[in-house]
Amino acid sequence: MQVPRVKLLMGSGAMFVFAIIYGWVIFPKILKFMISKQVTLKPGSDVRELWSNTPFPLHFYIYVFNVTNPDEVSEGAKPRLQEVGPFVFDEWKDKYDLEDDVVEDTVSFTMRNTFIFNPKESLPLTGEEEIILPHPIMLPGGISVQREKAAMMELVSKGLSIVFPNAKAFLKAKFMDLFFRGINVDCSSEEFSAKALCTVFYTGEVKQAKQVNQTHFLFSFMGQANHSDSGRFTVCRGVKNNKKLGKVVKFADEPEQDIWPDGECNNFVGTDSTVFAPGLKKEDGLWAFTPDLCRSLGAYYQHKSSYHGMPSMRYTLDLGDIRADEKLHCFCEDPEDLDTCPPKGTMNLAACVGGPLMASMPHFYLGDPKLVADVDGLNPNEKDHAVYIDFELMSGTPFQAAKRLQFNLDMEPVEGIEPMKNLPKLILPMFWVEEGVQLNKTYTNLVKYTLFLGLKINSVLRWSLITFSLVGLMFSAYLFYHKSDSLDINSILKDNNKVDDVASTKEPMPPANPMQSSTVHPVQLPNTLIPGTNPATNPATHLKMEHRERY
């Protein structure tokens, strides 16, 4: 078969160009287009079903800081903390009352989180352990009144002594009572000061309190948030513009917040954290709005990672240094006065939750060193306390993530309330939580066999084509070099076969300078056996000796 050198050159060159264009340009665009059509929140799509009703629970961990020297701290001593945890819960997420707006390409929904205690994963903890924490009503209430309504201090102090008789600055209670079942708030007194204090419970200003009858309430950190409305979102469906998939456009039916003194901090940036757009660039970061903080937070790319053998990108985030970052000054009480900004690595939640609470990373990780030095018992480190996400950019899939956040009391002495008048001024850690997810193989295989299998096939195909084209180009160069018009493949194969035949039948060549040799006639030896041997024949009968010339 004759292959003209010009055709061989053109064919090999065309194959090379096709491999480059198809493998690195056309195929990626086709794949991205297919993903963009599949990954939307359009009713009836698989992504919509997974997004609205997460078919598996997230892991929710609670770590509590037990104060081991409460009486000394009440007199101004340095707090000694003992971390107790994790108390493990299964967190189920679902969205209900979904309303689609086809024109705006949005969907509105109400988010609901349900926490179910996991006794097996919590062992040896049971949830009935007694914990000592700052009094969750007296301390935040007293500090808030001193800062904002000092004229009412005497009335509030008297009311607290009636509603919480003999109360101290620190409360000892079971974990489940503090966080879910609730501690009792008795508003049955007819005293004016007690009634005035209880007004904030009856009007719903204390969001963590649940009314059980006409005169009693139960207060807990998370009980009211369990299996209840946690906010109504409106997000983009991504049908018309896939890059906007999941983007929050409204929360509580408002296009922006009215919490912070500057408008920029009130904007919604990113998604609701349960879905992300595919095809993001790693330098864009992963942004999500967090209602608990009344703020959007962004995670930034750190390095490449892998999950179950699939490549991913590791993202991390922190709360930053509000004082040092001009773009974050709107989170200060007064953006013009930097002294009102919280310390590095913390965020003041007073405007968001209505109390003297501060958010931070667990153990004040990446925070001001003074925060760690003010208390005993903290050990900040990246492994246990950093926030991270392992994310696959092309499909927009988070493979695993750990969202960690610590809640602290911005504590100070309160002269008007006897149990609080000698408290030290510092930021006291109370507890921290971790919301984690690790996709199992059922869901990672969806990505593996729809995305990575296609990428692998494309990689094999393009490199195979490139290899064949390079071989063709080398043969073409050979023909042009030898000025041959064509390549006779049959002749080459025939010549190769001839070479193989000659190589297999060729006799071995004699030595260059052969020496004469003679066989010495065997000498008859006595038939004697050596103990331990049993030769079949006498070796001397096969002995050959070289005949050497004497000089």
From Swiss-Prot:
UniProt-listed Pfam families: CD36 (PF01130)
GO terms of molecular function: scavenger receptor activity
Alphabetized PANTHER family for the sequence: SCAVENGER RECEPTOR CLASS B TYPE-1 SR-B1, SENSORY NEURON MEMBRANE PROTEIN 1
Record gene name: Snmp1
Function as written in the Swiss-Prot or TrEMBL entry: Plays an olfactory role that is not restricted to pheromone sensitivity.
This protein's name: Sensory neuron membrane protein 1
Main location: membrane
Lineage, top ranks: Eukaryota, Metazoa, Ecdysozoa, Arthropoda, Hexapoda
Transmembrane segments: 8-28, 460-480
